[in-house]
Amino acid sequence: MTIEKDESTWATFKRLWPHISLYKAGLGVAVVALVINALSDTYMISLLKPLLDEGFGSADSDFLKKMPFIILAMMFIRGLSGFVSGYCMSWVASNVVMRIRRQIFNHFMHMPVSYFDQESTGRLLSRITYDSEQVAAATSKALVNIVRESASIIGLLGLMFWNSWQLSLVLVVIAPVVAFAISNVSKRFRKISKNMQTAMGSLTATSEQMLKGHKVVLSYGGQKVESERFDNISNHMRQQNMKMVVAQGLANPIIQMIASFALVTVLYLASVDSIKETLTPGTFTVVFSAMFGLLRPLKGLTSVTSDFQRGMAACQTLFELMDMDKEKDDGTIEKDTVKGDIKVDNVTFTYPTADGPALRNVSFDLPAGKTIALVGRSGSGKSTIANLFTRFYDVDSGEISLDGDKIEDYRLPNLRKHFALVSQNVHLFNDTVANNIAYASEGKFTRLEIEKAAELAYASDFINKMDDGFDTMIGENGASLSGGQRQRIAIARALLQNAPVLILDEATSALDTESEKAIQSALDELQKDKTVLVIAHRLSTIEDADQILVVDEGEVVERGNHAELIAHDGAYAQLHRIQFGD
């Protein structure tokens, strides 16, 4: 599960900064353009003083004649700087988000299976999509506004103090109050943003659950149940959005009200004789206009704080994910090939979320080139043993070795390349048939080898009938294929990999009897000179195994070949009678 911890905005931004600083050229250009944009506004206000004191106050002044050209030039500079800053910041933001998304995606692929057992897919998708978009908003729109409005405030303050430091001293009193208000608003925005992330994760998870289980929903008339579930979650999301709206709506007028006290005070002080004597109409107008002009950047800073805090909250969540431990891979052994001699010695294993062990003191030898079958009731621990071979999970105690070396001593990628897995839960990718059969081979196999593997898996007939044959896109998880067709492609994938150790976890469970017999012949050919672990419910498929282990409640309760177990008349013989009606 994701570890919740609260970091300060500054601490989170410091961690985000290395990602942003990689694109400092674009960032630097954007900052310069933003400062120019802000200073152009300040310069426009500063023109009021010569306009009033010289333009209208002097008969021979030609300042009025220059004003139209100055305004046109400033508008051009303002427009150009606005475009450059917007483009550069968007470029920086898109690259930062792409980089973070890639890191999250790659981190997900190296996280232990146990993590995904506890997290919903929808919530994880929300991290890659929604949360990263909030980071984009923080690094583009938010940073643009923060830099521009901050530069505007600094420029206007400088202009005010330059023209009348006496009137401008009012801000020394007002500034801490405004800073305190913005600080409190930021904390509120951060809290609401975290809640919105959680709500969005629930929304995505609920939607994904309904879409994946659409047939079940229709079959059981679950539309009302799912609709009510989604209504509740979407209403929670709406409530969080409204809380953000309320926070933003109250923050702006409160801060502007505080700033308005400064305006009122300036008007009052301007009437004091000692100060009034130092003011010209132009000076007073510039100071008052600059102070009034501060309201816009103050409002902008308050508004953008919500986007920035939302982005920082998303950053914190993403960084928490990136801080989570990857699969433990401390091994150093790498072998091009192995014999496939496997020993399981007194292994006990408990799933992270389970109360009791799934396996208890399991021991057996699987010599190279031999076949061992695991049989037993559902949930007895058969598939768990297969998962331990490839280190999808690590044992609590005991040891599993491959060719005399503990599997923990192998590097994970190297260990797994020695195993070919055909599971009852087939996963296919939204790609061509050929690419699914040769998945992750990176050009290692020729087209002829791919087609040969499909032929051995008795998949060629239905593949060749497709519109584009082996180049046909099969949709998400092979949605356009039947269960048997999907499983035959998975078998072809294992045939092509030709690994020394083969794990067949209910490999023919989705096939009809005729297809099963055909594929069994291919599997028999495939198993020659290989170490094979077969997990099966259909006892007819494992009668020729060198040894059969009967697993019950995580323990091996019987072992022997088919004839020996039938003669023993124990648990295996009972299963055999149930299936064959003997």
Swiss-Prot record:
Domain ABC transporter residues, every copy: 342-578
Domain ABC transmembrane type-1 residue range list: 29-310
Signal peptide: none
Localization per record: Cell inner membrane
SMART domains: AAA (SM00382)
CDD domains: ABC_6TM_MsbA_like, ABCC_MsbA
Main localisation: membrane
Coiled-coil region: none
Residues binding ATP: 376-383
UniProt keyword annotations, A-Z: ATP-binding, Cell inner membrane, Cell membrane, Lipid transport, Membrane, Nucleotide-binding, Translocase, Transmembrane, Transmembrane helix, Transport
Membrane topology recorded in Swiss-Prot or TrEMBL: Multi-pass membrane protein
PROSITE patterns named in the record: ABC_TM1F, ABC_TRANSPORTER_1, ABC_TRANSPORTER_2, MSBA
EC top class named in words: translocase
Domain notes: In MsbA the ATP-binding domain (NBD) and the transmembrane domain (TMD) are fused.
Entry-linked NCBIfam families: MsbA_lipidA (TIGR02203), PRK11176.1 (NF008381)
Task of the protein: Involved in lipopolysaccharide (LPS) biosynthesis. Translocates lipid A-core from the inner to the outer leaflet of the inner membrane. Transmembrane domains (TMD) form a pore in the inner membrane and the ATP-binding domain (NBD) is responsible for energy generation.
Name of the featured protein: ATP-dependent lipid A-core flippase
Organism: Aliivibrio fischeri (strain ATCC 700601 / ES114) (Vibrio fischeri)
